[in-house]
Amino acid sequence: FKQSVRIVEVLEKKGQGLNLTKEVRDGILNHRTSGNPATLEGKIVRFSDKIAYINHDIDDAIRGKIITEKDIPREFADVLGDTVKDRLNIMIHDIINNSMDKPSIFMSPDVERAMRGMREWMFEHVYRNPAAKGEEGRAQQLIVTLYEYYLKHVDELPEEFRMMMETRGEKKERVVCDYI
């Protein structure tokens, strides 16, 4: 997630970076389960990220025919809802209702338990599914191929990336990663 901060602080606006507050940078750095956001904004980003990922991943898995809506366990759908719209509505309102007038951001135990259970179910049935793993392998190979190509052909990078090497002394490996 350091790359996410690098993008907003160094790469955005053609190398000028964005003038973000400490709270927003904290949210970006600590939006995954491994980080511990120090600010309310960071905690909101963490919850938002979890909600977005689970719903997008369910939607992607259904469109990719890895699962169907009927495959989703009732114990989770009964709490979180049957559609993306329902799940978003329930989770967002649950956070609002459980965080109002409190010093931190909370989700009710039932909704949090269902969301955690849904995530575990997704790991078993989607993320570790051979079809999904095959796509992951192809995506990784594509990134490696692009990386190796641009290391040999830095002259084909957009000018703003080539300039990072010339004016800032950035190493080509770093610039190629930034571009990809």
Which residues make up each language-model segment?
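Histidine-centered, transition-metal-coordinating active-site segments
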Residues: 2-179
